[in-house]
Amino acid sequence: MKNINGIGIALVTPFNKKGEIDFISLEKIVSYVINEGVQYLVLLGTTGETPTLKLKEKIDIINCVKNISQNRIPIVLGMGSNNTEDVLLTLKLIKLDNFEAILSVCPYYNKPSQEGIYNHFKTISENTDMKIIIYNVPHRTGTNINLDTINRLINNRDNIIGIKEASGNIIQSYNFIKHKIKKDFLVFSGDDTIGLPIVLGGGDGIISVIGQAFPKELDFIYKFAYKNQVNKAYKLYYKIFKILNLVFKEGNPSGIKTLLKIKGLCNKYVRLPLLKGSKTLEKKLYIEYNNMLKTQ
């Protein structure tokens, strides 16, 4: 298995004006982030607007990204549902060769108990040899996975290798890092706004949204963090701080697509029920982006 740590990119799914997948822009983004030094890719996650994609579109995206990446860096595939049986079916329908792991979100809407969450991931792990990264994002799912459940899972299932922790609760993240019962269990930040302190506190990296706009900047930020050069890391972090806050003002991925449009990487079209970033947001991002360029 290739090494999954450092900076992973939660890829957008670019669309054209007709709402069709813009594969040329997808190829451009994938090539850009790989060439700029990110460590791995994550596709078909929240940022990729996966709930709006048909199965054939998902397969086409997978093939496109594989073709461009050419095994240069690891790829993690998003595969989650609030129906456990749906995940098991998807495992059978999609070819998982050349993927290093799957990223599977905690069941949403149903609001299962911790025992339900445990059995959901236990069942998935029993039905695949793939490595599994749990995705905890309670502000979207309505359910938060706790430390005891994580430790039960990793104690009983060797192929559950990590968690993308996006609760926004840095204390919870630190608890996962400090009190996990397996040292090699990976804890990734799933939140760009607190990714740096999580890595400085012992986390294994970040699955980033903003990184597809600033891959080189993030590469430097986190390399400084791993070397415990805190001042240098934060100096670079604060250069993108205003942009980072703006990107999430109108939701994800509307904001990041607006920024990617400014950078010439893709259009800002999204699929309903999301709306594309407003002209006001685009103007603010344009100003801050140009201000940032002036300081380099």
Swiss-Prot record:
Reaction(s) catalysed by this chain's protein: L-aspartate 4-semialdehyde + pyruvate = (2S,4S)-4-hydroxy-2,3,4,5-tetrahydrodipicolinate + H2O + H(+)
EC top class, as a word: lyase
Cellular component GO terms held in the UniProt record: cytosol
Compartments where found: Cytoplasm
EC number, as in UniProt: 4.3.3.7
Residues holding pyruvate: 47, 207
Residues flagged as site, Part of a proton relay during catalysis: 46, 109
Cysteine-cysteine disulfides: none
Entry-linked CDD domains: DHDPS
Any one GO MF annotation of this record: 4-hydroxy-tetrahydrodipicolinate synthase activity
Active site: 135 (proton donor/acceptor), 164 (schiff-base intermediate with substrate)
Recorded metabolic or biological pathway in which this protein acts: Amino-acid biosynthesis; L-lysine biosynthesis via DAP pathway; (S)-tetrahydrodipicolinate from L-aspartate: step 3/4
Gene Ontology biological-process annotations: diaminopimelate biosynthetic process; lysine biosynthetic process via diaminopimelate
Record's keyword terms, sorted: Amino-acid biosynthesis, Cytoplasm, Diaminopimelate biosynthesis, Lyase, Lysine biosynthesis, Schiff base
Family in the record: Belongs to the DapA family.
Subunit structure: Homotetramer; dimer of dimers.
Function: Catalyzes the condensation of (S)-aspartate-beta-semialdehyde [(S)-ASA] and pyruvate to 4-hydroxy-tetrahydrodipicolinate (HTPA).
PANTHER family the record matches: 4-HYDROXY-2-OXOGLUTARATE ALDOLASE, MITOCHONDRIAL, DIHYDRODIPICOLINATE SYNTHASE
Identification of the protein by name: 4-hydroxy-tetrahydrodipicolinate synthase
Source species of the chain: Karelsulcia muelleri (strain GWSS)
Lineage: Bacteria, Pseudomonadati, Bacteroidota, Flavobacteriia, Flavobacteriales
